[in-house]
């Protein structure tokens, strides 16, 4: 269906003569897979429990002896992941090929549209965004080297959503650095507000044009975001309204952040007052 389509023409942008990176899916090495699971097993804080997702992915790691040391748990993880990795090695290879074929049809048009939307070009020296494919419970991203990881068995719609979501973060933070160079690098990650805000804005950005014309998925952030309320209104609804305004992207980013900062700090103040 997509072979004869040119998304750049469909959404009204030009993709010629522009330096754009390419997402290249690659098979995760066994050691890389082991390292991700070692991290994920002990990650039990933040907006979601990565540990719980890890147990679902590797049920053999559930109910380990509580007397085991971290090094002993690492050894169990190495054995479990090695066994499963070798069992699914051929599928990891075939899924890597499938992911590359599917995303290639969207790569240039999406990255061009994202650059146009955020009013910032991709870094000139960024030729490739590496996406490693393995047996993992979540899709970690690595801002400093423009890469992310993904598991096998992801359907077409979800694959496109993950690619769009993770790479949005890469260019989003390039724009954030341009607007707010004073923000420390550590605040780009959990649990800081700048990070939380970056995860919230994927909904109002990707669910609107031009991206909603390009993709058929419905972008959704963490469930906890949709439970936040500001008086009688949903915070996410108000954030969507901000991003629907006919104002510059810089104004949207700043107004949205100031709003989220006010609401979340107000919520903290109210909890303190009740103590």
Predicted features and spans:
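Pan-zinc metallopeptidase signature
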Residues: 222-275
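Hydrophobic (often cysteine-bearing) scaffold residues that line and stabilize catalytic clefts
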Residues: 106, 160, 194, 198
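Flexible internal linker/loop segments at domain or repeat junctions
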Residues: 146-148, 174-183
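Active-site recognition of the HExxH zinc-binding catalytic motif
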Residues: 161-177
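Auxiliary, metal-adjacent structural segments of Zn-dependent hydrolase domains
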Residues: 83-144, 208-215
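N-terminal low-structure segments adjacent to metalloprotease catalytic domains
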Residues: 1-101
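Post-HExxH zinc-binding segment in Zn-dependent metallohydrolases
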Residues: 19-20, 26, 182-231
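Short pre-active-site segment immediately N-terminal to the catalytic Zn-binding motif
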Residues: 148-163
């Amino acid at each position: 269906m997509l072979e004869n389509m040119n998304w750049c023409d469909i959404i009204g942008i030009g993709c010629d003569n522009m330096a754009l990176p390419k997402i290249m899916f690659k098979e995760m090495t066994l050691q890389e897979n082991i390292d991700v699971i070692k991290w994920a097993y002990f990650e039990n804080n933040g907006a979601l429990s990565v540990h719980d997702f890890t147990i679902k992915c590797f049920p053999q790691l559930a109910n380990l002896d509580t007397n085991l040391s971290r090094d002993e748990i690492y050894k169990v993880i190495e054995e479990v992941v090695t066994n499963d990795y070798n069992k699914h090695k051929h599928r990891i290879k075939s899924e890597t090929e499938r992911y590359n074929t599917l995303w290639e049809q969207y790569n240039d048009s999406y990255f061009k549209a994202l650059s146009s939307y955020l009013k910032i070009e991709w870094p000139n020296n960024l030729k490739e965004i590496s996406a490693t494919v393995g047996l993992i419970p979540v899709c970690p991203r690595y801002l400093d080297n423009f890469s992310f990881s993904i598991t096998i068995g992801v359907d077409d719609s979800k694959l496109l959503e993950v690619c769009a979501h993770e790479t949005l973060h890469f260019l989003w933070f390039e724009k954030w650095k341009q607007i707010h160079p004073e923000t420390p690098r550590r605040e780009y990650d959990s649990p800081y507000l700048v990070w939380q805000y970056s995860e919230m804005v994927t909904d109002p950005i990707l669910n609107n044009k031009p991206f909603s014309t390009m993709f058929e998925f419905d972008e959704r952030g963490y469930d906890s975001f949709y439970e936040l309320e500001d008086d009688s209104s949903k915070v996410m609804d108000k954030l969507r309204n901000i991003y629907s305004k006919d104002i510059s992207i810089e104004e949207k980013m700043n107004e949205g952040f100031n709003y989220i900062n006010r609401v979340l700090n107000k919520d903290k103040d109210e909890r303190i007052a009740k103590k």
